[in-house]
């Protein structure tokens, strides 16, 4: 994945970056409810999870700061595009990681996502493929309606955004 090094000394958020970087637990999270009525209609017979994943990853990539990662040498890189790495559940209830690389049209993304899921469900593991630092880590817990999930982070320098959602509900 291609990225550009950001000069944090000249970045308008330099102070905030330094402040949070010095913390032992520098992570912040936000929980929002999203109306997916239009998406449910527009997706037709296409898979719900991959349709929502496509929309979420497009939205996250539209925010440059969400594409920024801290490199091992402490520099900050802004990726041109960040793909999702998400969990897929095998028939035995064990989950594995699946990745769909690249910025692509909706129909292509759905087909590629289905292909990759078949592949990882046959032989997948908890090992990530590709440039792990570029990923958005995505989890879905579709049998539980929840308002927050706090996924684990490897270290304080782990700067991959985590995105999750639970069971969707109908609200009148």
Regions found by a protein language model. Name each.
Residues 1-33, 49, 135-139, 144-172:
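Flexible, Gly/Pro-enriched loop and linker segments at secondary-structure and domain junctions
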Residues 30-32, 53, 60, 66, ...:
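Long, contiguous hydrophobic alpha-helical segments, chiefly transmembrane helices and signal peptides
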Residues 28-44, 95-108:
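Acyl-group handling in specialized metabolite and lipid biosynthesis
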Residues 90-148:
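Helical lid/core segments from catalytic subdomains that handle acyl or acyl-like groups
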Residues 66-99, 128:
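Small-residue-rich loop/turn and linker elements
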Residues 78-80, 130-132, 157-159:
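A short, structural micro-pattern
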Residues 40-64, 172:
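Acyl activation and transfer enzymes in specialized metabolism, enriched
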Residues 40-41, 77-81, 146-150:
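Short, solvent-exposed polar/charged micro-motifs at secondary-structure junctions
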């Amino acid at each position: 994945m291609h990225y550009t090094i950001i000069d944090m000394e000249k970045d308008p958020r330099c102070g905030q970056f330094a402040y949070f970087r010095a913390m032992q637990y520098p992570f912040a999270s936000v929980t929002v409810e999203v109306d997916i009525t239009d998406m449910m209609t527009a997706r037709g017979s296409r898979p719900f999870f991959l349709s929502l994943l496509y929309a979420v990853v497009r939205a996250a990539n539209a925010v440059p700061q969400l594409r920024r990662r801290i490199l091992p040498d402490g520099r900050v890189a802004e990726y041109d595009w960040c793909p999702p790495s998400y969990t897929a559940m095998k028939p035995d209830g064990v989950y594995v990681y699946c990745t769909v690389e690249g910025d692509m049209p909706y129909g292509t993304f759905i087909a590629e996502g289905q292909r990759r899921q078949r592949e990882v469900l046959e032989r997948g593991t908890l090992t990530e493929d590709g440039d792990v630092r570029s990923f958005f880590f995505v989890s879905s817990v579709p049998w539980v309606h929840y308002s927050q999930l706090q996924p684990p982070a490897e270290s304080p320098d782990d700067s991959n955004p985590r995105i999750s959602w639970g069971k969707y509900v109908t609200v009148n």
